[in-house]
A protein has these predicted regions:
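Transmembrane beta-barrel wall of Gram-negative outer-membrane proteins
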Residues: 236, 240-263, 276-316, 340-369
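Short, acidic, small-residue-rich periplasmic hinge/interaction motif at the N-terminus
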Residues: 29-34, 41-46, 71, 75-80, ...
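Membrane-embedded beta-barrel scaffold of Gram-negative outer-membrane proteins
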Residues: 364-368, 576-630, 635, 759-762
Length: 805
């Protein structure tokens, strides 16, 4: 009997314990007002410590005990708190929540919520470029250069340097496909339009280092662009003194498309330079992006681009004054029968296929092709004199003495044809708190290159250089090379999020491997980053990233200049060239706070990059000339600071400050700074509006950057170097908005179909500062050399009109 009593009591105890331990789950999605998922939203059951956080898809799960009147609190930086009360909770349930921005809209000005950044990848709002005063014609890169760690010393170019790296060390993706630049570009005047069309852009992400393994083999940075998939009809058209653009987006059931056209002519801007010339630059491109979704599980995309850049230049004369106030030097040139005609044409196409195998697994296939035909033709003949004086450069005037008189001629017939094709596969799988990503790609490259260029100078009738026994050209360069090669690459990575008593951790680790058939080199690149949001202060985010980043050579790096028996410089290809390597160490964090009821964020990052197997290079304007051999090592270290927030209520602005030191040792003997190491860089992006009348907007972009090291042409750093003066520039734009539905003129006739009309005026280089980008070198009969500065653009007024519909 006692045995039965004990058994019954044990069963009753177990049943009671099971009932007491019963739990229920609340799951759901948290989205913003636009329907986009919100990551890192904190969900807490009121008056308890029980909580959870949303993942990158905005999904959350929270476990609790059954009860009546359960209250959930949803909080996220930049959004109003939301509270949801469940009157009776006795079973699992789904609860979706929408959160609203904390900022108040002021007319058409609205503050973007400050998102948490647990990796080194930073999000950029693409719509900020719309009213940004930009001499390059409106590019995403013009906004990127205002970020900490990024610098640019040429307003005519969309190229940029990140933490002392080369322009070629930055990788750009559009919809997951790598895009390429022309290779022969030697000046900002020739460069034309950036590949990325801001009108078509939906989102922009940028990392200045320590990026994930899924991004390719570059040493400095990654710019990741995603184009729009419109849900309804939209479009805009703009025109200015620099050119114009237009785009149209639409959605037709299962098909959506966005197509854009751009035209740029910087003739008026180039007219502010020292050279009096007939400038005729014509840059055009058309891009289209189509999406087809036959089912909820299948998506197909096509991206196409055609770009044609033509640059025609007929110089007449040039007059440049330089030096100190007490000692002015004048350089005057006449150009008889000189001209330059360049043409760059690129074609790009990419097709992607995505298949959602399940709720947690997505697979993809992609194929792309890039074709570029580049042609550079010029014959520039000049008669010059270099003189000292304070009035003008006329040699017949008193007080003027000729320091050097002579003639020169520059000749080039350069052609390059490059073709790059690749096919690849990608995949992602979400398993519990892990997001596993993988991919593999094979890339075929075919490049043919023909170079024929030379330069001849004479002073007082003597050809230079003077050797005493022979007369030769000051420089010449010839090549006729072809290369066909194949690259293989693959990666796998895992993003793992977990919570402890200390806070939320985000760990991303992966490895990337590549092989290039041309130099028969394997490279392996492990990368890892860790983000942490502490429980004691969720306004604080800390992160650490490290990894080994290789940069496999492309065609430009392979060029090795040697001399033949006749003394001519000949370009050969170095198939023993190996990948450059950079080991990154980055530690940093963000702190978000409110000041005067406005949102602010302070970001700081310390970094150190150990560089070896470097291929040294020199820069002339934007043309990069590599040594063609792995003969250097070095380092880059610095501090990047960025202060972001509502400097003016209802607007986003920021100030970026970068301090750095970057050096290289060439052939174990020559120490020199890296070519793109300014030492310091201060950038400002500022937005404002007219007090009491918010339809008048002001956008300001300012840059103060240290000078870059310059070497004597064809000599390299072994012959010494000096730095250009600091780069200083402020561009200002003022715009007036006619808004649909609120302006009387917009309710009449044709205007009622428009959303907005913007009328604006830009003042480029408002302080009219003469910035030096490169130097023209004058050699006297005694082989003494003078460096004459090539100044960039002066002050220029630009008028703009933007129509949105």
């Amino acid at each position: 009997m006692t045995r039965y009593v004990i058994t019954i009591l044990a069963l009753m105890f177990a049943l009671t314990s099971a009932m007491a331990q019963k739990t229920v789950k609340i799951t759901g999605y948290v989205r913003d007002a636009d329907g986009s998922p919100l990551e890192l939203v904190n969900i807490r059951i009121k008056n308890t410590l029980n909580g959870a956080m949303t993942n990158e898809k905005g999904f959350y799960t929270i476990t609790t005990t059954p009860g009546d009147s359960v209250a959930l609190i949803y909080s996220c930086l930049g959004f109003n708190k939301a509270e949801r009360i469940i009157p009776s909770l006795h079973a699992d349930m789904r609860l979706n929540v929408q959160m609203n921005y904390t900022s108040l809209e002021l007319g058409e000005v609205a503050v973007t919520a400050i998102r948490r950044q647990t990796t080194t990848m930073e999000n950029i709002q693409a719509d900020r470029i719309k009213l940004l005063p930009d001499p390059a014609g409106g590019s995403i890169e013009s906004l990127v250069v205002t970020f900490a760690g990024v610098s640019s010393n040429n307003e005519l170019s969309s190229q940029y340097s990140v933490r002392g790296g080369s322009y070629d060390e930055n990788i750009v993706y559009v919809n997951g496909i790598e895009v390429f630049r022309p290779l022969l570009i030697r000046s900002g005047q020739q460069e034309g339009l950036s590949f990325v069309n801001p009108d078509l852009t939906e989102s922009v992400n940028f990392s200045a280092g320590g990026f994930e393994a899924r991004y390719g083999d570059k040493m400095s940075s990654v710019l990741d662009i995603t184009y729009k998939q419109p849900k309804h009809f939209e479009g805009s058209a703009s025109a200015s003194l620099l050119g114009g653009s237009a785009y149209v987006g639409s959605s037709m059931g299962k098909v959506s498309q966005v197509t854009g056209f751009r035209y740029k002519s910087g003739r008026s801007l180039l007219g502010t330079m020292d050279t009096d010339a007939e400038y005729d630059p014509r840059f055009m491109d058309i891009q289209t992006y189509w999406t087809y979704k036959p089912t909820n599980k299948i998506e197909m995309n096509f991206l196409g681009n055609l770009a044609t850049n033509k640059y025609h230049y007929v110089p007449h004369s040039r007059e440049t004054s330089f030096g100190t106030t007490d000692e002015i030097t004048n350089f005057t040139v006449w150009f008889p029968n000189s001209n330059e005609r360049d043409k760059f044409q690129t074609l790009f196409g990419a097709l992607t296929f995505k298949y959602k195998a399940s709720e947690k697994v997505e697979l993809g296939l992609q194929a792309s092709a890039f074709d570029s035909k580049e042609e550079e033709r010029y014959d520039i003949a000049g008669e010059y004199w270099l003189s000292d004086g304070t009035e003008n450069s006329n040699m017949s005037d008193a007080g003027i003495s000729a320091m050097s008189v002579g003639r020169y001629m520059e000749h080039a017939r350069n052609k390059l044809h490059s073709n790059v094709m690749n096919v690849g596969t990608t995949g992602t799988a979400n398993l519990l708190n892990n997001k596993i990503s993988w991919g593999a790609q094979v890339q075929f490259e075919r490049i043919s290159d023909h170079i024929s260029e030379w330069e001849k100078r004479d002073s007082a009738g003597y050809s230079l250089p003077q050797t005493g026994t022979a007369v030769s050209l000051i420089s010449n360069l010839y090549s006729d090379n072809r290369i066909e090669s194949t690259r293989f690459s693959a990666y796998v990575q895992d993003a793992f999020k977990f919570r402890t008593k200390q806070g939320l951790f985000t760990l991303v680790g992966g490895i990337r491997g590549s092989y290039w058939s041309y130099n028969k080199e394997f490279i392996f690149s492990p990368r890892v980053s860790l983000g942490f949001i502490p429980n004691f202060d969720q306004n604080l985010t800390m992160r650490f990233a490290t990894g080994i980043y290789y940069q496999s050579p492309f065609y430009k790096e392979l060029r090795l200049t040697t001399q033949d028996e006749a003394g001519n410089d000949v370009v050969t290809l170095n198939n023993n060239l190996k990948s450059q390597r950079s080991i990154h160490f980055i530690i940093g964090g963000d702190y978000t706070f409110k000041l005067m009821d406005r949102n602010f964020k302070l970001t700081a990052e310390l970094y150190y990059k150990k560089l070896d197997n470097l291929i040294p290079y020199t820069i002339d304007n934007v043309k990069v000339r590599y040594y063609g051999e792995n003969c250097a090592k070095g380092y880059a270290a610095g501090l990047d600071l960025k202060f972001f927030g509502e400097f003016v209520p209802g607007t986003d602005s920021w100030i970026s400050l970068s301090l750095m030191k970057a050096e290289q040792t060439i052939r174990e003997t020559t120490k020199a700074p890296l070519p793109n190491s300014p030492g310091y860089n201060l950038s400002v992006f500022f937005q404002d509006y007219f007090p009491g009348y918010k339809r008048v907007k002001l956008n300001l972009k300012g840059v103060l950057s240290g000078g870059l090291p310059v070497t004597i042409p064809h000599r390299g750093y072994e012959a010494g170097y000096f730095r250009t003066p600091a780069y200083k520039r402020i561009d200002l734009g003022v715009s007036y908005q006619l808004a649909g539905g609120t302006d009387a003129i917009m309710d009449r006739g044709f205007f009622q179909y428009l959303k907005n009309i913007w009328i604006g005026v830009d003042v480029f280089n408002i302080l009219d500062i003469k910035n030096t980008n490169s130097y023209y070198w004058i050699t006297r009969a005694d082989n003494a050399q003078f460096a004459v500065p090539n100044y960039l653009t002066g002050r220029q007024i630009n008028a703009r009109l933007i129509v949105e519909f």
